Amino acid sequence: MSPDSGPEIAVTGNFWLGRGLSSIWSLVKDSISKAESEIQIAAYAIGENSDEYEFFELLRGVLARGIRVLLIVNRFSNQRESVRKILLELASKYSSFVLKDFNPQDKREDLHAKLIVIDHTTALVGSANLSFKGMVANHELMLRLSGRTAYHIGELLDRLSVNSESVKGGPNG
């Protein structure tokens, strides 16, 4: 585990882009492309336009390389049908894709965090949902963190995974 380095900031939105900061989508692509063994993702919402910014293609690419992907989705059954269908297809095609449903009995409780952790060494923490609006159109902010901080965020996702249900329909559910 390397020591913490300073956070890197990425943004979306017309009033924030173009001021020497990376775009969120560029930061996500760059970080995920460097994965060596595992990617953990916590998602509140995955938008219907996700394929427009290549999120599913990015997942397919890392899964084809044999990278383990854990995706914990808030209330999977409430996600758009087209998104659920694609995720179930990925789960059935790739044994290294673990799809989990965070669906607590208390309806006031949600997984609202937007997190991506790569190899327990890099963490992306931000406000953007996995949607066209979140990754491109809205004014959103994301930080890339490393070292102990990223490791601890990965541990939190490990704990959340244990307390989430495997989605029925894939080999892991």
Q: What residue ranges belong to the model's regions?
A:
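PLD/PLD-like phosphodiesterase catalytic module centered on the HKD motif
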Residues: 1-29, 34, 38, 47-173
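Glycine- and other small-residue-rich loops at beta-strand/loop junctions that grip anionic moieties
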Residues: 44
